[in-house]
């Protein structure tokens, strides 16, 4: 019986050695078009943002947010939709420390309102959390974030 347990242990060791604590960045980011869910303030980034407060709560505001989209492409570029135009940028993320860099952000029109908030959130994004269903981007201080998801329009 002990021999059987030892055999199972030795067979499982390669699986344990192959584990990686880092995120699969492409699985998370390149999982389709993301819609803006809301902007949040407060909360504790290290504790699943307990106590974070949504900036927008009215149904019309949420619909307007969901119209804003961002698509992370495997070639390191971004394509997005604002209320009055589109935007592009470059992105890179590190799955080990969950940092993100968004650079060379260009818009086809001057962003205003919620579009401006999204553009500013992307410019200031330094950290991310999430999976292929939801994504949170936070600035360096981690005191606010934008949440993205795959929401129906």
Each model region followed by its residue ranges:
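Sec-dependent bacterial lipoprotein signal peptides
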Residues: 1-17
């Amino acid at each position: 019986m002990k021999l059987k347990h030892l055999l199972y242990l030795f067979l499982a060791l390669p699986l344990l050695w192959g584990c990686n604590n880092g995120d699969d960045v492409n699985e998370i980011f390149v999982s389709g078009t993301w819609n803006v869910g809301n902007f949040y303030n407060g909360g504790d980034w290290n504790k699943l943002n307990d106590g974070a407060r949504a900036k927008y709560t009215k149904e019309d505001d949420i619909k307007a947010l969901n119209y804003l989209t961002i698509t992370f492409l495997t070639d390191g570029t971004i394509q997005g939709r604002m209320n009055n135009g589109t935007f592009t940028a470059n992105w890179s993320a590190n799955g080990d420390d969950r940092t993100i860099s968004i650079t060379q952000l260009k818009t086809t029109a001057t962003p205003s309102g919620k579009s401006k908030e999204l553009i500013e959130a992307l410019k200031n994004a330094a950290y991310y959390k999430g999976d292929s269903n939801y994504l949170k981007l936070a600035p360096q201080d981690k005191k606010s974030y934008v949440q993205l998801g795959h929401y129906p329009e």
